[in-house]
C-alpha cells in the first residue's frame, strides 16, 4: 500500500506525462507549510521561463500586512505575480500542474488569481 506522499508523487508524475503530450508550457505549483512556489516551465521541460514564490524578499515585504506565506492571501499574490511574469516572457497559455496536491485552498487560490491576471488554462 502506498503512503499518502507516494500517492501524491505518483499523481504528479502521471500529470507531467499528460502535460508533456499536450505541447504547452506548464504552470507548476509546489506548496509547503510556510511557502508556496510557482514556476512556468517550457514545453519540453528544459527551461524555467518564469517563477514566483513567497520566499522572495520582495514578496515577503508585501506580505508584511498579510502575514506568513502559507495562507490563501499569499497564494493569491503569487498567482498574480506568476501570471505577470509569464506574460512578460511571452507565455499566454499553460497547462496547470498541481503536483498531485488537491485543487483546494492555496492551490485553488493561486490558480484562480493566475486566471484572473490573464493566463489561460
From Swiss-Prot:
One of its GO terms (biological process) is translation. One of its GO terms (cellular component) is cytosolic large ribosomal subunit. Pfam families: Ribosomal_L18p. Keywords: Ribonucleoprotein, Ribosomal protein, RNA-binding, rRNA-binding. The keyword Ribonucleoprotein applies. SUPFAM superfamilies: Translational machinery components (SSF53137). This is one of the proteins that bind and probably mediate the attachment of the 5S RNA into the large ribosomal subunit, where it forms part of the central protuberance. Belongs to the universal ribosomal protein uL18 family. PANTHER family: 39S RIBOSOMAL PROTEIN L18, MITOCHONDRIAL (PTHR12899), LARGE RIBOSOMAL SUBUNIT PROTEIN UL18M (PTHR12899:SF3). Part of the 50S ribosomal subunit; part of the 5S rRNA/L5/L18/L25 subcomplex. Contacts the 5S and 23S rRNAs. This is Large ribosomal subunit protein uL18. It comes from Delftia acidovorans (strain DSM 14801 / SPH-1).
Amino acid at each position: 500500500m502506498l503512503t499518502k506522499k507516494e500517492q501524491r508523487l505518483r499523481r504528479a508524475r502521471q500529470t507531467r506525462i499528460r502535460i508533456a503530450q499536450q505541447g504547452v508550457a506548464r504552470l507548476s505549483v509546489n506548496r509547503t507549510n510556510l511557502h508556496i512556489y510557482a514556476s512556468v516551465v517550457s514545453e519540453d521541460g528544459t527551461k524555467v521561463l518564469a517563477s514566483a514564490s513567497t520566499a522572495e524578499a520582495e514578496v515577503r515585504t508585501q506580505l508584511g500586512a498579510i502575514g506568513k506565506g502559507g495562507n490563501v492571501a499569499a497564494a493569491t499574490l503569487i498567482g498574480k505575480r506568476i501570471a505577470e511574469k509569464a506574460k512578460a516572457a511571452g507565455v499566454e497559455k499553460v497547462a496547470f500542474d498541481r503536483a498531485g496536491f488537491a485543487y483546494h485552498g492555496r492551490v485553488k487560490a493561486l490558480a484562480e488569481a493566475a486566471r484572473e491576471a490573464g493566463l489561460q488554462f
